[in-house]
Amino acid sequence: MSHIRTVLGHSATQVRGRECCPSLFRTTDTAQILERIDGRSQESKRGLLPRLQESAALLNLNVHAAAGFAAAGAIIAGIIRNSEPEFDSARQVIQHDHPDVAALALSARLEDGVVLHTTGTADRDLREKTISSFVGITAPPWGVADSATVVQITMPGQPRSTSLVPAIHIALLRLENLLADLTELYAILRRDPPASSYVFISGPSKTADIESKLVHGAHGPREMHVVVVDLTR
């Protein structure tokens, strides 16, 4: 360390702490950020939607707005109806065991020939059902407008495989849970740290390993949709 200090132009014996660089270690006022989130009006929340759509367009991420669960269910059923399986002719869909997903009533909306699975902690065939499904439906607890990100938290009945394995990932997000930026998200996570693993998802899988050509779907979903549902309309 003494050599590094010398190279950086400091005394070899000078031990520098955080107090020497306050701007690097500035702490965020979590309480103030949470107060801002809690005080955001419904109109202000709706104002975040165009920001999300603008950010998503750069990431090949499709954003849909829905007024209520019925409209959201119709949108999702339409996506499934107009999509084809990538590797198999079987049309299977897997959805999280979540009350918001259940409110979509997809079993009554999907056409004949589409098999709908729901994740369950006691289902021994869950792995095979997930692999066989070309669409995975989740209900992330938070979304971020500025980075077009959804936060997927692993919970009982809500495995991360649903968002990672199927070729198409559809995320159902409540408008009330759409945040402005990552600063707000980190404030939420500091207040309510997840008990299990979680991932930030910003669009479909992307890689440019070969000849610097961008390819979607090599290591995960090739297509992603976020359906933002406004429950006040």
At which residue positions do the language-model features occur?
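The feature marks the mature, well-folded catalytic cores of soluble enzymes
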Residues: 1-233
